[in-house]
Amino acid sequence: MRRVLITGFEPFGGERINPSWEVVKQMNDLMMGGVRIVARQLPCAFGEALTALNTAIDDVQPVLVLAIGQAGGRADITIERVAINVDDARIPDNLGNQPVDQPIIQEGPAAYFTRLPIKAMVQGIREAGIPASVSQTAGTYVCNHVMYGLLHRLNQFNNEVKGGFIHIPYLPEQAVDHPGAPSMSAHSVLVALELAISIALQIEHDLHITGGAVH
């Protein structure tokens, strides 16, 4: 049976929950068109997150890997285009590490592009009435660290496997502690992630439409 690995993070930065894991854990053992979804939680820690991810990939042997993370302040589902080879942490991770301008992979390329049909995924999610867009940066914290490490592995050892990263907004129960911050319901995020998986599994070549940004 084909399997999809989807990951979420533990809470970080003083938050009580992390929306990525709150939604992703609901998808564990979900069957979608003959494909089984396997959910795993990653620690919000440089290095440790990639160790956990690589262990999960070895265990699950997926055809698709989707890593999900919290992007507090963003209003929509944002599918990441690129990961860069640098850790530059504005705040410490959950183990107290705060790397500055450190490469994720020594001698690795400057960046990797996603292995997902991101524009088709955005279009499909929008057609379901859920705000979504292509993001041009995954940041320089643990989310980018995981995306870069994932794509490095896939490019080196699992070239047939699709993979990438999706950022999601705060849940409403988090936004109450951040006045003015946008949020999205867990149900909407869940629907969006199910659509993202379905489209990623079906589409081999992305849509030739704009998903760029002016700044």
Swiss-Prot record:
Described purpose of this protein according to its UniProt entry: Removes 5-oxoproline from various penultimate amino acid residues except L-proline.
Primary enzyme class: hydrolase
E.C. no: 3.4.19.3
Task: Please list the disulfide bridges.
Answer: none
Catalysed reactions, as listed in the record: Release of an N-terminal pyroglutamyl group from a polypeptide, the second amino acid generally not being Pro
Question: What does the sequence similarity comment in the record state about its family?
Answer: Belongs to the peptidase C15 family.
Instruction: Supply the SUPFAM superfamilies for this chain.
Output: Pyrrolidone carboxyl peptidase (pyroglutamate aminopeptidase) (SSF53182)
Catalytic positions are E80, C143, H167
Localization, per the record, is: Cytoplasm
Give the organism, scientific name: Yersinia pseudotuberculosis serotype O:3 (strain YPIII)
What does the record give under GO molecular function? pyroglutamyl-peptidase activity
PROSITE patterns per UniProt = PYRASE_CYS, PYRASE_GLU
**Which biological process annotations from GO are given for this protein?**
proteolysis
Q: What is this protein called?
A: Pyrrolidone-carboxylate peptidase
Which keywords accompany this UniProt record?
A: Cytoplasm, Hydrolase, Protease, Thiol protease
Question: Which InterPro entries does the record cross-reference, listed alphabetically?
Answer: Peptidase_C15, Peptidase_C15-like, Peptidase_C15-like_sf, PGP-I_bact-type, PGPEP1_Cys_AS, PGPEP1_Glu_AS
Q: Name a single GO cellular component.
A: cytosol
